[in-house]
Amino acid sequence: MTTSLVLNPRWPADTVMFVYENNLDDLNKNMEGLVGSGNFAASQCRNIMAHSAAAAALGGHPSGLVHSSTGYSTVDVTATSSNDTLTSSGKQCATGPCPAATVPHQSSSAATALPYSYFGNGYYPCRMGRGSLKSCTQAAGAALSSQYMDTTVNSDEYSNHRAKEFAFYHSYPSPYQSMASYLDVSVVQTLGAGEPRHDTLLPMDSYQPWALTNGWGGQMYCSKDQGQAGHLWKSALADVVAHQHDGSPFRRGRKKRIPYTKVQLKELEKEYAANKFITKDKRRKISAATNLSERQITIWFQNRRVKEKKFVAKVKSNAP
C-alpha cells in the first residue's frame, strides 16, 4: 500500500509530502516500535508513521527521529484505505516536544513546494514541530517531486497558487484585482457639430454591473433586459424605413409604373385586333419594333383580355 501525506504548515516553510510503502499492519508495528523506543510517551502522536520506508522510497538516507521544543501546527487529514473509508479528526498531541519523521527534500536555494501529491491507499494524520524537518540535498527527491506533482510552485506563492484554482467560485474571495470589462467604453464617440446624431444599433449604456452576493472581486456585466435584441432589430428596421420615406433613392417595393407611348399602344392594339393570343414570332417582332421586352408584351395582352372581359360583362349586366 502506498500512503501519501501533504503537510501545509501555517508558517512559511516547504510543503512536505510523505510517501510510505507499507500496509496497515506494518504501520501499526512501526508505531508500536516507536512507542517502545522510549523517546516519547504512548499518548503522544500515536498516528505518526514510520519514516524508514519513505526514506528508502524517496532515495533519501534514513535517520532517527528529531525532537522539537517549538510549537507545531495541527494537520487534520481524512484517513482512507483500499477496503473502507474512515474519517479521522487527528489525535491531538500534548503540549511539549513531538517527534516527526525526517523527510529528504531539496535545499533551501532550490526549495519547491508540492501542491499536488500522489494519494495511495492510506492517509493518516499527524502533528509536526516547526523545526522538526531536516534538510538534505538529494537528487532523487527532485525526481520524485516531478513524478508526484503536476506543477511546481514556490512555497511563498503556494497560497496564491491555490487561490487561482478557486478564483471562479462565488464563495471564494478573490485576491486579485478586478479585470476591466469589455463593455465599459461606449462604441460611439462624440460626433461633429454638423453631423446628425443617430442612436447606435447596440447601445452599450444598457449594461449595468451585476453585484454578486458571496463576494467576487471583479464585476460582471449583463443586460437589463435579455429580450431586448428583438426590440433593437425592430427599431433598426423602422429607422431604415423612415429614411427611405424621406426621399432616399434606395427605396424598396414596386417599380414605378411607366406608361406606354402612343406608338407602342398603336402597335399592340393592331396586333390584338388581329389575334387576341399573340404567338412567339409575333411577340419577337413587336418587341423589336416597340423597344419593349417580350414579357411586357405578354403581360399587356393578358391585361387587355381581362379588360375586354370585364367590359363585356358590364355591358351584359346593363342590358335589359
Curated annotation (Swiss-Prot):
GO MF term set: DNA binding; DNA-binding transcription factor activity, RNA polymerase II-specific
Compartment(s) where it occurs, according to its Swiss-Prot or TrEMBL record: Nucleus
Sorted UniProt keywords: Developmental protein, DNA-binding, Homeobox, Nucleus, Transcription, Transcription regulation
PROSITE patterns: HOMEOBOX_1 (PS00027), HOMEOBOX_2 (PS50071)
Disulfide bonds: none
GO CC annotation terms, alphabetical: nucleus
Annotated region of DNA binding: 253-312
Domain of life from the UniProt record: Eukaryota
InterPro entries: AP_axis_regulatory_Homeobox, HD, Homeobox_CS, Homeodomain-like_sf, HoxA13_N
Coiled coil: none
Alphabetical list of SMART domains matching this protein: HOX
Family: Belongs to the Abd-B homeobox family.
Summary of the function given for this chain in its UniProt record: Sequence-specific transcription factor which is part of a developmental regulatory system that provides cells with specific positional identities on the anterior-posterior axis.
Protein name listed in UniProt: Homeobox protein Hox-B13a
Originating organism: Takifugu rubripes
Gene: hoxb13a
